[in-house]
């Protein structure tokens, strides 16, 4: 265990050295187009929702920004590891936006080695505050460590040790209500970076938040009229925030940030039984 721990330390040190060297290269060559050599504001986002929200906030002023998305569509956020080039982009950013959940363990090393010491570091889970929810284990969910499904009795009596570190569900963007809050928080930071166009950014944000609010009302209308209010999900369940927003029940193979991907026969059988019991038409994946 000790040798493995030392190996991890050496790997992190090597990665940080690569970051510093790459950042220096970009600084000397001007390839990255940072704020020092082209007057633009560099914003780096780890995931698409942040990226898309900021696109809507900056609107017609997009030419004032270099907006970068690190994790491309289709990539698994849970297993993403940045390249040296990605780390260099982060290092010279004026604003770095990340989720702040368990999948972002690499972020904290990255921000410690930033070239731009005035960087705005935006942790979305921190912005969300008390609305961030703990990872939840419900009846029938397959356990990561022990390979069995939880029963209703285990869930109600809290079989997990109390000393376990609390893990928060990082899928915060899968809630329209959360999106409304986060768009405004991101707007506030962008207005600090470009005070000359602050009114335009706020106007763009207000219009986009109105669209989100309208979508939220549509969700509420459709769900309130629905006969069935239970979701059965045959994979990791990322929709904790959404189901809580609209008082839906759910069963799933794994918790949202589970390392498991292969459901056991017992788990599949349990979910199939819940489809019959609740009258839902299918297991979603």
For each feature predicted by the language model, list its residue ranges:
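Single conserved hydrophobic/aromatic residue that forms the stacking wall/gate
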Residues: 1-13
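Sec-dependent N-terminal signal peptides of Gram-positive bacterial secreted proteins and lipoproteins
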Residues: 12-33
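Extracytoplasmic metal-acquisition and chelation regions
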Residues: 27-285
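Low-complexity, intrinsically disordered short peptide segments enriched in small/polar/basic residues
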Residues: 6, 16-17, 38, 54
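Compositionally biased, intrinsically disordered low-complexity segments
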Residues: 1, 22-23, 38
